[in-house]
């Protein structure tokens, strides 16, 4: 029976799944927008959102936990210096998943995963 077993297998071993979601989380935090399949996007929430919640409280222990889950010093710095402060007042729901059609090969449902309050296109330039 499958009672109380959460998460998707995605036709991968546990080590492959762990590595894939670690890499996807790093890409998401680096670019703030990624495109992936819908089941992977929904499962990525379970990895990425707790990292942002962890980054709201800056401590050495939390930084070490974040590094253990991302293996990237640059991303840990961005998490604690930028994203943790950006979402300090938000109680969760840091990611947005937008469906974007189907992949042209296997017709897999695709989705964009983005951080909610990301800067779109940069600063506005005033006309002179």
UniProtKB/Swiss-Prot annotation:
Keywords: Ribonucleoprotein, Ribosomal protein. GO terms for cellular component: cytosolic large ribosomal subunit. Gene3D superfamilies: Ribosomal protein L17. PROSITE patterns: RIBOSOMAL_L17. SUPFAM superfamilies: Prokaryotic ribosomal protein L17 (SSF64263). Pfam families: Ribosomal_L17 (PF01196). The keyword 4Fe-4S does not apply. GO terms for biological process: translation. InterPro entries: Ribosomal_bL17, Ribosomal_bL17_CS, Ribosomal_bL17_sf. GO terms for molecular function: structural constituent of ribosome. The keyword Amino-acid biosynthesis does not apply. Part of the 50S ribosomal subunit. Contacts protein L32. Belongs to the bacterial ribosomal protein bL17 family. This is Large ribosomal subunit protein bL17. It comes from Pseudomonas fluorescens (strain Pf0-1). The gene is rplQ.
């Amino acid at each position: 029976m499958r009672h109380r077993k959460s998460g998707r297998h995605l036709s991968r071993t546990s080590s492959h799944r762990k590595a894939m979601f670690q890499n996807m989380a790093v890409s998401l935090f680096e670019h703030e927008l990624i495109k992936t399949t819908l089941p992977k996007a929904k499962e990525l929430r379970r990895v990425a959102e707790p990292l942002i919640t962890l980054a709201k409280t800056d401590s050495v222990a939390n930084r070490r936990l974040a590094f253990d889950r991302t293996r990237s010093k640059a991303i840990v710095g961005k998490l604690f210096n930028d994203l943790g402060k950006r979402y300090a007042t938000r109680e969760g729901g840091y990611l947005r998943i937008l469906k974007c059609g189907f992949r042209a090969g296997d017709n897999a449902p695709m989705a964009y995963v983005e951080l909610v309050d990301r800067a779109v296109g940069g600063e506005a330039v005033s006309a002179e």
